[in-house]
Each structure stands twice: as structure tokens, then as C-alpha cells.
Curated annotation (Swiss-Prot):
Keywords: Disulfide bond, Glycoprotein, Host cell membrane, Host membrane, Host-virus interaction, Membrane, Secreted, Transmembrane, Transmembrane helix, Viral attachment to host cell, Viral immunoevasion, Virion, Virus entry into host cell. The lineage of its organism: Viruses, Riboviria, Orthornavirae, Negarnaviricota, Haploviricotina. Residues 187-198 are annotated as: Binding to host heparan sulfate. It comes from Bovine respiratory syncytial virus (strain Copenhagen) (BRS). Residues 1-37 are cytoplasmic. Glycans are attached at T72, T80, N85, T87, T92, S105, N127, T139, T199, T215, N233, N251, S253. The record marks G65, N66 as: Cleavage. It comes from the Viruses. This is Major surface glycoprotein G.
Length: 257
């Protein structure tokens, strides 16, 4: 398209140059015949035509240059943006498979070493062991790595990931449905049955209850020695005893006189 437009512009300029030549020849002929007024008008019109043609050609070249600059800049931007957004699915799948197999091999080797070297007795209840099931083909997320416990103790169970292949408690063989990995672990685990840890209950000794005894209030009365020798079966009130003792004392005093 650009070559075709340039060819058309060249043809138009060539025709204009030929027309200007013929116009100049005609003006020279008129000048020879002493027609000065006609020559002046013709020259003025020729100057106006040339100026307008130059302005038009300049505008055309500027517009063509801007149109050419726009498509050249677009492909460079697209080429720079394409490698950033491009991701190959083959490499991601290959990396995922390699990491998945390495994680499974490390977890199985650790569990076998723990079972053979150490006689660890698990204190888990039977309900927890029945609820935990192992699946042979477990799908782990690519971004997450399972925690590795170097001390040999059993890590806590993650309730969100039921397919986690790392936590392997005592598994009965009845739960393994044709899974070779589960059957191998089941045979190893049957050699040592889990023993339940004894529960120790502390009895609280009851505190002895202390009861306060009521204090007796003693009333001291002035009595004579005769009243002291009276028997305890006397049912009279203490006031009557006091009055009788005083009367007896006065009678003795009168007899002595």
C-alpha cells in the first residue's frame, strides 16, 4: 500500500511540473508581444499555485510519517509482553510429579526407620485409628510442603488435609482395600500392638469438719456450807435455796445470842 501511494504522488508532481513548464512558455510568449499586465497577473497566479502545492505536499508527508510510526511500535510492545505472561504447562506438571514422589519416598523411609529402631508405643484410642484412613494416591498441593519431624515423634493430625500421607498411626489390615503400601505398613504394625497408657486417678481426701462446742455460762452465788451439802435431786429454784439458807442463818444467830 505504501509503494502504491508513493507512485501516485510522484505522478501528480510530474504532471504539475509539466503544467508549470507550459505556463512559463506561454508567459514568455506574452512578454515578447509587450503584454505586461497579463504577464504580471499570470506570474502572481503561478506563485500562489506553487505555494499551495508545497503546503499540501508537506501536510501529506507528515501524515504518512505518523501513520508509519504507529504500526512499528505496536509489535515491539507485544513481543516484550508475551514472554511475561507465557507459562509452559509441561514444566509445571513435571516439577509437581517429581516433588510429589520425593515427598512420598522420604515419609515412608522415615516411618520404617522409626518402626525398626525404636519400640514406640502409641497411646491413641481405637476411635481415632478407625477414623484415620490412608489412600494410596494422595493429591498434595504444589505450593505446600508437608512438615518433617526430625525427633521421631508423631506429628499432630491436620484435619483440613484428610489425604495427608505423613501421619501414619496404627492401621488394621481390614481397612486396606488392595493398597500395597497400606498392606506393607499393616504387616509391620501388627508386630507391635498399641498398648493403651494407664490412667492415674488421684483421690481427694476430704477435709475433717470442725464443730464448735457451745460455751456454758456459769453463775456464781454466795451460799452457805449447808447448802453445799444438799443433794443434787433438789428441784427447787436457786432463788428459793438462797432464801432458805439466809433464814436458817438468821435463826442460828438468834439462838446463839
Amino acid at each position: 500500500m505504501s509503494n502504491h501511494t508513493h507512485h501516485l504522488k510522484f505522478k501528480t508532481l510530474k504532471r504539475a511540473w509539466k503544467a508549470s513548464k507550459y505556463f512559463i512558455v506561454g508567459l514568455s510568449c506574452l512578454y515578447k508581444f509587450n503584454l505586461k499586465s497579463l504577464v504580471q497577473t499570470a506570474l502572481s497566479t503561478l506563485a500562489m499555485i506553487t505555494l499551495t502545492s508545497l503546503v499540501i505536499t508537506a501536510i501529506i508527508y507528515i501524515s504518512v510519517g505518523n501513520a508509519k510510526a504507529k504500526p512499528t511500535s505496536k509489535p515491539t510492545i507485544q513481543q516484550t509482553q508475551q514472554p511475561q505472561n507465557h507459562t509452559s504447562p509441561f514444566f509445571t506438571e513435571h516439577n509437581y510429579k517429581s516433588t510429589h514422589t520425593s515427598i512420598q519416598s522420604t515419609t515412608l523411609s522415615q516411618l520404617l526407620n522409626i518402626d525398626t529402631t525404636r519400640g514406640i508405643t502409641y497411646g491413641h484410642s481405637t476411635n481415632e485409628t478407625q477414623n484415620r484412613k490412608i489412600k494410596g494416591q494422595s493429591t498434595l498441593p504444589a505450593t505446600r510442603k508437608p512438615p518433617i519431624n526430625p525427633s521421631g515423634s508423631i506429628p499432630p493430625e491436620n484435619h483440613q488435609d484428610h489425604n495427608n500421607f505423613q501421619t501414619l498411626p496404627y492401621v488394621p489390615c481390614s481397612t486396606c482395600e488392595g493398597n500395597l503400601a497400606c498392606l506393607s505398613l499393616c504387616h509391620i504394625e501388627t508386630e507391635r500392638a498399641p498398648s493403651r497408657a494407664p490412667t492415674i486417678t488421684l483421690k481427694k481426701t476430704p477435709k475433717p469438719k470442725t464443730t464448735k462446742k457451745p460455751t456454758k455460762t456459769t453463775i456464781h452465788h454466795r451460799t452457805s456450807p449447808e447448802t453445799k451439802l444438799q443433794p443434787k435431786n433438789n428441784t427447787a429454784t436457786p432463788q428459793q435455796g438462797i432464801l432458805s439458807s439466809t433464814e436458817h442463818h438468821t435463826n442460828q444467830s438468834t439462838t446463839q445470842i
